[in-house]
A protein has these predicted regions:
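ATP-hydrolysis module of ASCE/P-loop NTPase motor domains
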Residues: 79-82, 100-190, 213, 275-277, ...
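ATPase/helicase motor core of nucleic-acid motors
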Residues: 90, 125, 269-270, 312-316, ...
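Conserved helicase NTPase motor core
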Residues: 5-16, 20-24, 55-56, 63-64, ...
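Helicase P-loop NTPase motor core
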Residues: 28-36, 271-274, 279-372, 395-400
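Proline-centered turn/helix-capping motifs that create local helix->coil transitions or kinks
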Residues: 147-153, 239, 295-305, 430-434
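Short glycine-/polar-rich loops that comprise or flank the Walker A/P-loop
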Residues: 20, 49-53, 78-81, 238-241, ...
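P-loop NTPase Walker
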Residues: 1-106, 110, 117, 183, ...
Length: 434
């Protein structure tokens, strides 16, 4: 039982329940990641499960890497055979092997948002639609929402009914998909969408993965959308040893398509499911937890849980209201300066803000008061122009059908090739059926 030593009673219960559906309601700071990694170790060490037969799905590459490292430390040899992945990474691996079974090319390119905008821009020209009424950002969001609901263009058209705008969105979606196929490209939503298509049309492929994954764990289940729900249901349809971990109280991604009812209705989807609540918090003071419990208890339709801790009471919570963002920034910076005068190094202080546009006023106040600061975040490495250009060259080498990448780098470095020449090349390619 060394795999679960040091865990509290509820954590041990969650780790040792291995057969059948399991919902772990993990409150904030309750040791969720620790439970998942120790549960994997328990399956391998105590239940003699082959690591090859275990799948753990997380939402970010960072979380996946952290989980791999933790499992490796606990299990040691053999841990590398556990499939720890994000939804999208898992689907890429599956499609690289089997996408040709449903008419795709396994050497597809994955388009990011900027690539999608380039495709939508051409689609709007083709359909003679006003970009002011149908912005690239809006079109991408509508297409993404449709794919997250596992809706094809025809499904969207049928749903549109007599709505002129919705009918145009369906046409944009249809033309977008046509161009994506011509470019041998998939967007991030396609990775899950096409995997669902593959499993639906090729039951032998689905069966192979169901036979491989005897034990499936899904982290942050409250953040899953409908297509991710369908994917999990497909994979768990064989052995039915599905463990999902999440907290409906932490569901904040509805604007990204997350469906909170995936976790709220888990017991309806799996009537024989066991539920384990992790309510002991290791991160916060009791003052913070009492305030959080008081606020979240007003939510309707939530799964009841009450976080508690053995930690100290801690300082009182200070809540300040300001007239506007300028007074707020002034109040925040004044407090930082006061803390510094009381002996707290600036390096030990941080300002958290909800949206990027809030930083401007805060930065102005910091500069005015000669407070040195460092911004955490900024432009992602792969979003830098020179990196994107280089990646597009590599994409063209790997996938000659990738028109978006070709258009981006045809004049990088400058070769005197203008829009007229590019349009002639594009027209000639269309005539040649390229």
């Amino acid at each position: 039982m060394s795999s679960i030593l040091g865990l509290n009673d509820k954590q041990m219960e969650a780790c040792s329940y291995t057969e059948g559906p399991l919902l772990i309601l993990a409150g904030a700071g309750s040791g969720k990641t620790r439970v998942i990694t120790h549960r994997i170790a328990y399956l391998i060490d105590e239940k003699s499960v082959n690591p090859y037969n275990i799948l753990a799905i997380t939402f970010t590459n960072k979380a996946a890497n952290e989980m791999r490292e933790r499992v490796d430390k606990i299990v040691g040899e053999g841990a590398e055979y556990v499939w720890v992945s994000t939804f999208h990474s898992m689907c890429v691996r599956i499609l690289r092997r089997f996408y040709d079974r449903i008419g795709g090319d396994t050497h597809f390119t994955i388009y990011d948002t900027d690539d999608q905008k380039a495709v939508v821009k051409e689609v709007l020209k083709t359909l003679n639609l006003d970009p002011k009424q149908y912005s690239e950002k809006m079109c991408i969001k509508e297409i993404s929402s449709a794919k997250e609901e596992f809706l094809h263009p025809d499904d969207l058209a049928a749903r549109a009914g007599t709505s002129y705008r919705e009918a145009n969105i369906a046409n944009i979606y249809r033309e977008y998909e046509k161009r994506m196929r011509q470019n041998n490209a998939l967007d991030f939503d396609d990775l899950i969408f096409q995997t669902l298509e593959l499993f639906g049309k090729c039951p032998d492929v689905l069966h192979a993965y169901q036979e491989r994954f005897h034990y499936i764990m899904v982290d942050e289940y409250q953040d899953t959308n409908h297509s991710q729900f369908l994917l999990v249901r497909y994979l768990a349809g064989g052995q039915k040893n599905l463990c999902v971990v999440g907290d409906d109280d932490q569901s904040i991604y509805k604007f990204r398509g997350a469906n909170i009812y995936n976790i709220l209705n888990f017991e309806q989807e799996y009537p024989d499911a066991k539920v384990v609540k992790l309510e002991q918090n290791y991160r916060s003071t009791s003052t913070i937890l009492n305030a959080a419990n008081a606020v979240i208890s007003n939510n309707k339709g939530r799964k009841q849980k009450k976080l508690w801790t053995e930690n100290e009471e801690g300082n009182s919570i200070i809540f300040n209201e300001y007239q506007d963002e300028y007074h707020e920034a002034e109040g925040v910076v004044d407090q930082l300066i006061q803390n510094h005068r009381n002996g707290v190094p600036f390096a030990d202080m941080a300002i958290l803000y909800r949206t990027n546009n809030q930083s401007r006023v805060l930065e102005e106040k910091l500069v005015m008061n000669n407070v040195a600061y460092k911004m955490v975040g900024g432009t992602n490495f792969y979003q830098r122009k020179e990196i994107r250009d280089l990646v597009c060259y590599l994409k063209c080498i790997s996938n000659p059908s990738d028109e978006v990448s070709f258009t981006r780098i045809i004049n990088v470095p400058r070769r005197g090739i203008g829009a007229t020449t590019i349009n002639k090349i594009r027209d000639e390619a269309a005539m040649q059926g390229c």
